[in-house]
């Protein structure tokens, strides 16, 4: 039995990683999924290194945040900066990946299972990133967790119980961080399983063909093992070299000013501004005065991606009116995301130049790698 199971596992890996025939008309943008997988693997590896020292920073002294972790062991601050920058880069690549697959879905048919696992991966990444955002226990993350947990308390019937389960008390304390830390460690391994399922289903249905594959005169095929591995690795190596250089020179650009303030439970922060990849969701929560309606709009935003699964079902039953679902989901997800992102920056007057210079250089790195 063990031999058969081992043979099945190696056969699936060999088929999906080595012997898969893909189109020769795949641009470098198609390698964003591979880059996302590498970034998630690096995030988990760096997070495991940080988790060994998290308890030592939190338990002995109340509300001592992990920005001082560089005093505990060598290279601790560099590892923490890598973990934070990898998160920003992960979301940057993730949003580009979603734009790419929406474009492909507007042109070609897509598999329902591929979209389903991709939707679950997106939701899990959101949950893991928000929990990780609250773990450093800075002034910004503490009040951000307080605001979001109070919003969850507005859910009818079960909201107050969810809030008390998260807090483990009448207020946020050390045990709250320990529980969130355990969840933050457990969920990435579930995410790896979903990524494996997404990877297998994608290669099984071959739902990301090139543009020229729809024409009968184009038959060029290549093995996945050598050509596309080298192209994807070249892109990810350029990105990692750029990030390491940026950390060594401008290591402070990933932190807001409130990230250096120790938590004062009796004083609210002057402004509560999450990371850039949470700005659209934060804008939905704050767009209406009622907390429950803001939470409802947040679920509508996440449900916009789920509409693509309905689109795949409608295509499967040959209902061409599915373009309505695609248009609705595109408007809900991206126009509202960009609107919430820009409105928060305009209202809060946050200085953009620190982050703009990073993303401009990153786009330059993509141009150097040639997206062809």
UniProtKB/Swiss-Prot annotation:
It holds the Pfam family Cytochrom_B_C. Heme b b562 binds at residues 83, 184. The chain crosses the membrane at residues 32-52, 77-99, 114-134, 180-200, 228-248, 297-317, 330-350, 351-371. It comes from the Eukaryota. Its cofactor is heme b. One of its GO terms (cellular component) is mitochondrial inner membrane. It is a multi-pass membrane protein. Its main location: mitochondrion. The keyword Transmembrane helix applies. Gene3D superfamilies: Cytochrome Bc1 Complex, Chain C (1.20.810.10). The keyword Flavoprotein does not apply. GO terms for molecular function: electron transfer activity; metal ion binding; oxidoreductase activity. A ubiquinone binds at residue 203. Heme 1 (or BL or b562) is low-potential and absorbs at about 562 nm, and heme 2 (or BH or b566) is high-potential and absorbs at about 566 nm. This is Cytochrome b.
């Amino acid at each position: 039995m063990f031999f058969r199971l081992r043979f099945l596992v190696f056969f699936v890996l060999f088929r999906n990683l080595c012997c898969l025939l893909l189109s020769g008309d795949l641009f470098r943008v198609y390698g964003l999924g591979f880059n996302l997988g590498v970034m998630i693997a690096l995030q988990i590896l760096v997070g495991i290194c940080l988790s060994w020292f998290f308890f030592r920073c939190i338990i002995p002294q109340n509300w001592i945040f992990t920005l001082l972790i560089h005093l505990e062991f060598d290279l601790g601050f560099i590892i923490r900066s890598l973990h934070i920058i990898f998160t920003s880069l992960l979301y940057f690549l993730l949003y580009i990946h979603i734009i790419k697959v929406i474009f492909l879905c507007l042109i070609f048919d897509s598999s329902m299972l591929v979209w389903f696992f991709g939707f679950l991966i997106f939701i899990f990444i959101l949950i893991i990133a928000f929990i990780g955002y609250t773990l450093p226990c800075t002034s910004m993350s503490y009040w951000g967790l307080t605001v979001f947990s109070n919003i969850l308390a507005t859910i009818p019937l079960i909201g107050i119980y969810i809030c008390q389960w998260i807090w483990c008390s009448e207020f946020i304390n050390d045990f709250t961080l320990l529980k969130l830390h355990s969840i933050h460690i457990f969920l990435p391994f579930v995410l790896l399983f979903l990524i494996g399922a997404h990877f297998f289903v994608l290669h099984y249905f071959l739902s990301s063909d090139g543009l020229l594959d729809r024409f009968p005169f184009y038959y060029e095929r290549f093995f996945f093992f050598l050509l596309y591995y080298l192209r994807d690795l070249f892109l990810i190596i350029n990105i990692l070299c750029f990030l390491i250089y940026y950390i060594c020179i401008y290591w402070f650009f990933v932190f807001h000013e409130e990230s250096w303030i120790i938590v004062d439970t009796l004083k609210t922060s002057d402004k509560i501004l999450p990371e850039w990849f949470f700005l659209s969701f934060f804008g939905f929560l704050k767009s209406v005065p009622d907390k429950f309606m803001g939470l409802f709009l947040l679920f509508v935003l996440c449900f916009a991606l789920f509409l693509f699964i309905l689109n795949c079902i409608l295509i499967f039953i040959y209902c061409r009116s599915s373009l309505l679902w695609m248009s609705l989901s595109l408007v809900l997800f991206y126009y509202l995301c960009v609107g919430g992102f820009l409105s928060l920056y305009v209202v809060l007057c946050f200085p953009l130049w620190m982050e703009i210079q990073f993303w401009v250089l990153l786009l330059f790195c993509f141009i150097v790698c040639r997206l062809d």
